[in-house]
C-alpha cells in the first residue's frame, strides 16, 4: 500500500473526497471503470482515462454519453503496430490465472472430476482447449504446457498459429478455427479457456450450453 505521505512527498495534494477531485481536475485517471456516483460527477469536456469495457455495460455507456465528458478506454489504446499495450498486461495475467483456477476447479474437493491436469505416471494428462491465440491464449498455453497438459489452441489466423508453434513446438496442437468442428473438440475437453478478443466489442459466443452439456 502507498501511504498518503508518499504521494505528498512526490508533490501530490490529497483531496478529502472524490468529489473534490472531480470538481478540481481537467483529467481523471483511474484503473477501474467509474462507479455510478462518479459518473454523475463528470462534466462536459472533462477527460476520463481508465478501463471502461463499455460493450458489456450499457448503463455506464449511457451515463458517460449524458455527461458529455471525453472518455478514453485503456483497453482500446493501440500503438504504432496496432497492438493493445495497456490491455496486454491484464490479458497476460488473465491467461495464466485461467489455467491455475481451472486446474483447481477440476479437483474433487471443488466439485470437479478429480483430474490432475498434468497427469501422472500411468495416467493421461488432461485436455485443455484454448480459444484464441492472442495474449490470453498464449499465456494460458504457457502455464498449461508447463503443467504438461495436452493443449489445443484454436485461432482463425494460420500465421498466428505458426508463431505459437515456433514458441511451443510439439507441446501444443494448433487448430485453424474454420477447419474444425468445435463441438467435437469441446466434448473431449477437460478445461476450456475462452480468449477471443474483438477490440471494443463483446467477444463472439462460440460455445453453446448444448456443447458443454448444460
Could you describe each region identified by the protein language model?
Residues 158-159:
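Helix N-cap at the beta1-alpha1 junction of Rossmann-like dinucleotide-binding domains, i.e.
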Residues 2-3:
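Short, small-residue-biased leader/transition segments that mark boundaries at the very start
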Residues 132-134:
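Glycine-rich Rossmann-fold phosphate-binding loop(s) that bind the pyrophosphate
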Residues 24-25, 189:
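An anion/phosphate-binding loop that grips the pyrophosphate of nucleotide cofactors and donors
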Residues 150-152:
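Short beta-strand element of Class I
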Residues 137-138:
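N-terminal Rossmann-fold NAD(P) dinucleotide-binding loop
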Residues 36-127:
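Glycine/serine-rich phosphate-binding loop and adjoining beta1-alpha1 elements at the start
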Residues 166-214:
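Rossmann-like adenosine-cofactor binding region
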Amino acid at each position: 500500500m502507498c501511504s498518503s505521505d508518499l504521494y505528498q512527498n512526490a508533490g501530490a495534494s490529497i483531496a478529502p473526497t472524490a468529489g473534490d477531485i472531480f470538481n478540481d481536475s481537467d483529467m481523471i485517471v483511474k484503473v477501474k471503470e467509474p462507479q455510478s456516483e462518479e459518473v454523475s460527477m463528470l462534466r462536459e469536456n472533462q477527460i476520463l482515462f481508465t478501463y471502461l469495457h463499455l460493450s458489456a455495460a450499457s448503463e455506464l455507456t449511457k451515463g458517460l454519453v449524458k455527461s458529455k465528458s471525453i472518455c478514453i478506454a485503456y483497453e482500446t489504446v493501440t500503438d504504432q503496430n496496432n497492438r493493445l499495450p495497456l490491455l496486454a498486461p491484464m490479458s497476460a495475467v488473465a491467461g495464466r490465472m485461467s489455467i491455475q483456477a481451472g486446474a483447481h476447479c477440476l479437483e474433487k474437493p471443488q466439485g470437479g472430476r478429480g483430474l490432475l491436469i498434468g497427469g501422472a505416471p500411468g495416467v493421461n494428462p488432461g485436455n485443455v482447449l484454448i480459444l484464441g491465440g492472442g495474449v490470453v491464449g498464449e499465456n494460458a498455453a504457457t502455464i498449461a504446457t508447463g503443467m504438461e497438459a495436452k493443449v489445443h489452441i484454436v485461432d482463425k489466423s494460420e500465421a498466428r498459429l505458426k508463431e505459437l508453434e515456433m514458441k511451443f513446438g510439439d507441446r501444443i496442437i494448433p487448430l485453424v478455427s474454420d477447419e474444425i468442428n468445435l463441438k467435437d473438440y469441446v466434448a473431449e475437453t477437460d478445461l476450456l479457456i475462452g480468449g477471443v478478443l474483438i477490440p471494443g466489442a463483446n467477444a463472439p459466443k462460440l460455445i453453446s450450453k448444448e456443447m458443454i452439456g448444460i
